Amino acid sequence: MGKKRVMVPAKDVDLSSIKYEPEIVQAPHLTGFWFRFFVRLIEAPLIGPFLLTMLKKENKIDQLLRNTVFPEEPMFKPEYPPQEKEHSVVELDEDGRPEGRVESALNCLPHYDPAKLWENSSATFRYWKIRDYAYAYQSRKVTPSMVAESIISMIEENGIDKPPTPLLLSFDAAEVRKQAAASTQRFESGNPLSILDGIFIAIKDDIDCHPHPSTGGSTWMHEVRDVKKDAVCVSRLRSCGVIFIGKTNMHEFGMGTTGNNSNYGTARNPHAPDRYTGGSSSGPAAIVASGLCSAALGTDGGGSVRIPSSLCGVVGLKINYGRTSMEGSLCDSGTVEVIGPIASTVEDAMLVYAAMLGASPANRISMKPSTPCLPTLSSDDDTDALRSLRIGIYTPWFNNVHSTEVSDKCEDALNLLSKAHGCEVVEVVIPEIVEMRTAHLVSIGSECLSSLNPDIEDGKGVKLSYDTRTSLALFQSFTAADYVAAQCIRRRIMHYFMEIFKKVDVIVTPTTGMTAPRIPPSALKSGETDMPTTGYLMRFVVPANLLGLPAISVPVGYDKEGLPIGLQVIGRPWAEATILRVAAAVEKLCGESKRRPVTYYDVLGAN
């Protein structure tokens, strides 16, 4: 590996000397027979380690981890200095009733008259908001049971819960009818639990939602792990009257960014059925984009909420690490993954977020989270807060995309925001981006392996899909020393970002470096390995996961093929209110260009 590299302490790095190095991922793109053959090779006792060593050498992974000296101590979980309070916000009681937090969130929203929009059809496409459903229920135009019947018929008639292109992996019409009947009764009695009462939400298949099994997109996880109750975040939503339509498709165990699932079939992008949805929360993003439900819950360990949200043209919120409990999810002990909402609008994501938030007792002790807040979008203070906003952009990184259509559209949105609200755009420098990517890969890979290893050792590994086996082979090559080195890098990157956040309030990037990739027909049966595409999809999402920061993807337009493009807003620690405020402003400026997906179900209009 050559002479070792000794890093200067992060606090002494001269940012003026930093030169951006484009991230180039070196790995073959394989499908079909050659992919299956490749997997068998890397799993072989002798040749496998050799091939993995060569791949890691090509991508400088071993050089960064094993031939570099980092003076920083490891940071095994995100640690933050004390943060300033956000401005023009409402504080929420995370120990209070979820219904109360949802009511507070509702009071933060700007004025909206569903009756006017309900009665006057518009040529401009828009998604039905949660407030539209609430108005329809309260005015007795429809009932939750009527909407449930529409959803059930759409699911059954279009094979949405069946191969070869399922959005749902677990669906029970009787269970949906039961929940809808209870909600209908509450409305008839004049006692809805909250504005979320009667709202239909889907749950990613690595989050427990009783009585459905949790498979993680695999063929066997439900055989070794019983679901006896809801995950904590699901339970909070249920207490608000939410109706759960089932468990959604996903990239097996979250180990992929396209959404490919050779076990059950691959979900398709509602804007282009020959394109991937993005992953790993493929089903949640696609089911929201297709109009079947108002929101969904996904998990995000490496962009898995934001990537598919961007590719499917919806909103995806990655909350701060530790902001809500992970209890009841398949990955409840890692340091990079969180549960977050996907919704058709920023305000709907905000309402769902308000219901589900609440740190676990352990994280309250170790992380000392700031009080959760929401932006007061309904007041004049919102305008003042936007006017004083400082937006950070690292231009060479921002522009390192597969097609300039992506960066151009995101830059247009940024210019609109600056022109409309007088926001200041500040050029920043982010050092060691390649090191950051490597540290994230080792962290999430080691944590996934630790979670799955007991079942793999028990013989379940051979039942995994080929692309999952590829990922696990790489993860198994990491050592304890690699993991510690990755955590030293985490501390360095945290220092850089905390220094940047002394100058700016948010950092803005494209959400992904490309629009939705085409699905190779040869990848449907056995999956594929395409690390260069993964590199483009994950280019901008890694900091929020490695550092635990809040981030949101909001749609800003389309490329020349009609594929959605998302803008990502990354916030300071615990600053969900700020990124929600920025996303709401961007959505308002770019919302008129929203297009109806090719695959769209008008659930509320059908009644």
From Swiss-Prot:
Family annotation (InterPro entries): Amidase (IPR000120), Amidase_CS (IPR020556), Amidase_dom (IPR023631), AS_sf (IPR036928)
Subcellular location: Endoplasmic reticulum membrane; Cell membrane
Entry annotated with the keyword Membrane: yes
Record keywords, A-Z: Cell membrane, Endoplasmic reticulum, Hydrolase, Lipid degradation, Lipid metabolism, Membrane
Annotated residues for binding of substrate: 301-304
EC number: 3.5.1.-
Xref: PROSITE patterns: AMIDASES
Keyword Disulfide bond (UniProt): no
GO biological process, one term: N-acylethanolamine metabolic process
Chief location bin: endoplasmic reticulum
Molecular function terms, GO-annotated: N-(long-chain-acyl)ethanolamine deacylase activity
Active site as annotated: 204, 280, 304
A GO cellular component annotation in the UniProt record: endoplasmic reticulum membrane
Reactions the enzyme catalyzes: N-(9Z,12Z-octadecadienoyl)-ethanolamine + H2O = ethanolamine + (9Z,12Z)-octadecadienoate
Similarity comment: Belongs to the amidase family.
Function noted in UniProt: Catalyzes the hydrolysis of bioactive endogenous fatty acid amides to their corresponding acids. The hydrolysis of endogenous amidated lipids terminates their participation as lipid mediators in various signaling systems. Converts a wide range of N-acylethanolamines (NAEs) to their corresponding free fatty acids and ethanolamine.
Subunit description: Forms homodimers.
The protein, known as: Fatty acid amide hydrolase
